[in-house]
From Swiss-Prot:
The keyword Iron does not apply. The gene is Cripto. A lipid is attached at residue 134 (GPI-anchor amidated aspartate). InterPro entries: Cripto_growth_factor (IPR017047), Cryptic/Cripto_CFC-dom (IPR019011), EGF-like_dom (IPR000742). Residues 135-171 form a propeptide. This is Teratocarcinoma-derived growth factor. It comes from Mus musculus (Mouse). It comes from the Eukaryota.
């Protein structure tokens, strides 16, 4: 955790002890009846209290070496990464994770099922899509290499394309 100067610590202690707060018609006053009139109500909200910075900084404005890909630097050494990035410095992009030679997000028929490369893993649907599979899926845990055992017919290709479009609408 960062260190605060003695003047900052003193200011926080004084503001807490005397409960400084904004007063209607004035910039800053001590909450004491001798300083402001009872006719002017005090506008006191806890959100106006002095709160020291916790060190959350935008990497674009201060520390460009802390976080990559638009991440937000926290306490000088941790990053809050935007969607699809991860790692200590937001250096990894999940959209670029492929399944071997298959690109991320690609759909392909694989041994009676329809599979998709997603975040570096090949995920296969449990339904059968190819003819000749007798209602069951063979080998769901497939590797990304290789080719399908048979070439799908035109009807099957259109059915697969429709399923892909339907599933892409859900994601």
């Amino acid at each position: 955790m960062g260190y605060f100067s003695s003047s900052v610590v003193l200011l926080v202690a004084i503001s807490s002890a005397f409960e400084f707060g904004p007063v209607a018609g004035r910039d800053l006053a001590i909450r004491d009846n001798s300083i402001w009139d009872q006719k002017e109500p005090a506008v006191r909200d806890r959100s106006f209290q002095f709160v020291p910075s916790v060190g959350i900084q935008n990497s674009k404005s201060l520390n460009k070496t802390c976080c990559l890909n638009g991440g937000t630097c926290i306490l000088g050494s941790f990053c809050a990464c935007p969607p699809s990035f991860y790692g200590r410095n937001c250096e990894h992009d999940v959209r670029k994770e492929h399944c071997g030679s298959i690109l991320h997000g690609t759909w392909l028929p694989k041994k009676c099922s329809l599979c998709r490369c997603w975040h570096g893993q090949l995920h296969c649907l449990p339904q059968t899509f190819l003819p000749g599979c007798d209602g069951h899926v063979m080998d769901q845990d497939l590797k990304a290499s290789g080719t399908p055992c048979q070439t799908p017919s035109v009807t099957t290709t259109f059915m697969l394309a429709g399923a892909c479009l339907f599933l892409d609408m859900k994601v």
